[in-house]
Amino acid sequence: MSSKRFLSPWKNSLEKPVIYHCVSRVVDRRFVLKEEEREKFRMFMRMVENFSGCRVLSYCLMSNHFHILLEVPPAPAEGVSDGEILRRLGAIYSEAAVAAIAREMEEARAEGAEALLGEIRLRHTRRMHDLSEFMKALLIRFTRWFNRTHQRTGTLWEDRFKSVIVESGLAARTMAAYIDLNPVRAGMVEDPAEYRWSSYGEAVGGGKKGNGKKAREGLVRANRCDKGVGFDATQWLEVAKSYRILL
């Protein structure tokens, strides 16, 4: 279900993040992703994003496939702290599950079992800052929900997801726009701002907080990553003007 189609020359680099355009299609390309499914998919996407440390720059959820422009940053050289591991786990696990992991870590620490503590950390951090792990977690979580909801079994996605590396700068801006224009090309809307299951639609209509803020941060990063700009939603109004022209 999950594989990297092209490996970046910066993979595991401590200097430069990698941007991927990821695509996956429903098996037989059936049109099964309706409103409820797209809302749930977006929810899982944000959950996995918050856990993994990867960031969604742009996305579009269609009726039988999706596009995600994903930035995969290098793992921090100093590692991920125990507190940060637990905070991120809270994005995908229940409070009870996170508390159990915290107790497991504390017991190992109290016993001076550094090797065991390292294994516990690695069990979770190996799933962070990694394209395949991000996609695996997202697709599996959504498939489980979809199969349970629709009383079905088996795979939902057609073959393996596809991914290609996108350079920062014009290539990243152009790819973000290409993704946001999917519903326009499909004749579903005339204005990409009207399509709520896309990064641009969410950035315009989602407000200044929550996922609306996340969408704005991602598009600011996609448009200005070559200038060293991070995920800064305060620059959205300025970026939105130039991005709208690109659209």
Language-model features: locations:
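Short catalytic/metal-binding and nucleic-acid-binding patches
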Residues: 1-247
